[in-house]
């Protein structure tokens, strides 16, 4: 299959380039905020709309700083050690989900400590909305022709312009489907049908567990980052970083279920 050659830049505002990648973050945050408000309206959990509004700034800082530093420290430290100014070039891409997740967790902890909010009540709502951003982010990765999959002989193999011109798995679309759409549906069903917000920590546990399972599985089809390659013979950095998420998620599910 031929890669649909979509310009990563949507338009320019003077010298400022508006990219699909940047837009995915902005739209993802806005849609997540809107959806979180709907959840609060329906279930009236410990978190109210004013608290959520106050947390948005913390969340944005956590996503951007955590995501960028996670990528810098985990995936390409040598480049940024030699060229530290490049750390600020977020418009070039290079964000780590695991780093962004940790950034949001730290931001949530600091916010809850300052405003005396229950930490897991907040993360349960965050967990329900994060797949929206994941879906849009992976679509943006696909448009950029980055984070593509391994070489395949399958008929749906795609030739990416920034690769070696061999047909590869469109793993960004796999991740958009499972980590975005499927995970969103799982958490929406749990939240609205099973009323999981009543069990503090359950939504957080479900998100961590299913995200980790999907990520570990899809990494089998995704090309390892060239600057890292495989770790321990055949594991990728994404798989290794997902293991603690799986353990913590399983623990939260067990702890949150009523006896």
From Swiss-Prot:
UniProt pathway annotation = Protein modification; lipoprotein biosynthesis (diacylglyceryl transfer)
Q: EC number(s) of the enzyme?
A: 2.5.1.145
The UniProt record gives the binding positions of a 1,2-diacyl-sn-glycero-3-phospho-(1'-sn-glycerol) as 138
- Signal sequence residues: none
Q: Does the keyword Metal-binding apply?
A: no
Annotated membrane-spanning segments are 9-29, 55-75, 92-112, 117-137, 172-192, 201-221, 228-248
Read off the PROSITE patterns from this record: LGT
Q: Where in the cell is it found?
A: Cell inner membrane
Biological-process GO terms, alphabetical: lipoprotein biosynthetic process
Q: Which UniProt keywords apply?
A: Cell inner membrane, Cell membrane, Membrane, Transferase, Transmembrane, Transmembrane helix
UniProt-listed Pfam families: LGT (PF01790)
Please indicate if the UniProt record lists NAD as a keyword: no
- Cellular component, GO annotation: plasma membrane
Q: Which domain of life is it from?
A: Bacteria
What membrane topology term does the record carry? Multi-pass membrane protein
State the Gene Ontology terms under molecular function.
Answer: phosphatidylglycerol-prolipoprotein diacylglyceryl transferase activity
Protein task: Catalyzes the transfer of the diacylglyceryl group from phosphatidylglycerol to the sulfhydryl group of the N-terminal cysteine of a prolipoprotein, the first step in the formation of mature lipoproteins.
Q: State the similarity comment.
A: Belongs to the Lgt family.
The UniProt entry, under HAMAP family, shows:
Lgt
Can you say what this protein is called?
Answer: Phosphatidylglycerol--prolipoprotein diacylglyceryl transferase
The species this protein belongs to is Rickettsia akari (strain Hartford)
The gene is: lgt
